[in-house]
Amino acid sequence: MALDVQSDIVAYDAPKKDLYEIGEMPPLGHVPKEMYAWAIRRERHGEPDQAMQIEVVETPSIDSHEVLVLVMAAGVNYNGIWAGLGVPVSPFDGHKQPYHIAGSDASGIVWAVGDKVKRWKVGDEVVIHCNQDDGDDEECNGGDPMFSPTQRIWGYETPDGSFAQFTRVQAQQLMKRPKHLTWEEAACYTLTLATAYRMLFGHKPHDLKPGQNVLVWGASGGLGSYAIQLINTAGANAIGVISEEDKRDFVMGLGAKGVINRKDFKCWGQLPKVNSPEYNEWLKEARKFGKAIWDITGKGINVDMVFEHPGEATFPVSSLVVKKGGMVVICAGTTGFNCTFDVRYMWMHQKRLQGSHFANLKQASAANQLMIERRLDPCMSEVFPWAEIPAAHTKMYRNQHKPGNMAVLVQAPRTGLRTFADVLEAGRKA
């Protein structure tokens, strides 16, 4: 392991120990034998308060192309809930390890680097994108790494995510941290932003173009809030769908052309049997929803793209309202996985159904650059202390979270800090 400790960080005094308390800083580059982590075990599968428990575990070792990052803050995503529940699959079925540390977003400090790592050094401030691969197949070398047979999501399909004092990542996962953001702001956006970026720009020829119209489900949530901003930045028009009227101003403030409250309509859930009385009633309501879109886009102008992630509850409507030759792009199924649709509208109107999963490094970096250039807002809604990581996930699971993205503090002792020096100073005053 190479330990290049030349950095811009001012020297500070700290004892060398085998375990540090949360918020306590080791000497730069010193890797303790153990660390605190919120661990999930197979026998605890269930809701977050049951599944996630604090444990003292071994600090991960790294190989030649890996990096150890001291985690300042982490983001809260739905895959942490899935990992805890063991639904739709248990992470243990994949990585076979005795415990699982969730967390697929983080900001932090490079703490140790493998001897083949050239682009990063100890002391660098970074954010982490969550795609990993083995790097040795044709998709990783000239294709799209997201299609690699070894592609996996760090913190969900790997056991060593960000809800711990240290995390092990591949060097290619690291990106520069936007210096104008706090540690917690920098920790909350990478997974959702990069996912939204690929959905909108990653599936040619249906990549988003200026002037096009996009329907965005869950427009006030973490994923939707970035979709609205990216669509607006690209010179296209976002039509946001909300479920609570008090979220309208938030979505319009992000740059949406218009907002629709889905509770004004009754066409949700699985598609009724085609041509049944229930189907006819569903179609009448779905067309009312389509007319609400026209109130924003203009009469007869259907959306070019539907930004899908609820899945089961909304998919029948999504596949109906997208225009001829348009695309429904979907990255999740937060309301259920049994997606139904009337295939007649699909083949006759030659619509595209496109699955989308996170992003490759080029896409994640392009999205991150927009954040560095201050073209996007991280839309951080709430920050939780280390001790409340399960509570943050429970809030998301029960759909009680505020509009935007949630973050949790790990080694950062409080909110509002922007540099490592800030962290050290806050630690001395604590």
From Swiss-Prot:
It catalyses: (2S)-ethylmalonyl-CoA + NADP(+) = (2E)-butenoyl-CoA + CO2 + NADPH; (S)-methylmalonyl-CoA + NADP(+) = acryloyl-CoA + CO2 + NADPH; butanoyl-CoA + NADP(+) = (2E)-butenoyl-CoA + NADPH + H(+). Despite some sequence similarity to zinc-containing alcohol dehydrogenases, this enzyme does not bind any metals. The keyword ATP-binding does not apply. Keywords: NADP, Oxidoreductase. It is an enzyme of class 1 (oxidoreductase). The keyword NADP applies. Coiled coil: none annotated. Optimum pH is 7.5-8.0. One of its GO terms (molecular function) is crotonyl-CoA reductase activity. Induction: Down-regulated in cells grown photoheterotrophically with succinate. Its EC number is 1.3.1.85. Gene3D superfamilies: Medium-chain alcohol dehydrogenases, catalytic domain, NAD(P)-binding Rossmann-like Domain. Catalyzes the NADPH-dependent reductive carboxylation of crotonyl-CoA ((2E)-butenoyl-CoA) to (2S)-ethylmalonyl-CoA, in the presence of CO2. This is a key reaction in the ethylmalonyl-CoA pathway for acetyl-CoA assimilation required for R.sphaeroides growth on acetate as sole carbon source. Is also able to accept acryloyl-CoA as an alternative substrate, yielding (2S)-methylmalonyl-CoA. To a lesser extent, when CO2 is absent, the enzyme also catalyzes the reduction of crotonyl-CoA to butanoyl-CoA. Belongs to the zinc-containing alcohol dehydrogenase family. Crotonyl-CoA carboxylase/reductase subfamily. NCBIfam families: crot-CoA-red. Homodimer. This is Crotonyl-CoA carboxylase/reductase. It comes from Cereibacter sphaeroides (strain ATCC 17023 / DSM 158 / JCM 6121 / CCUG 31486 / LMG 2827 / NBRC 12203 / NCIMB 8253 / ATH 2.4.1.). The lineage of its organism: Bacteria, Pseudomonadati, Pseudomonadota, Alphaproteobacteria, Rhodobacterales.
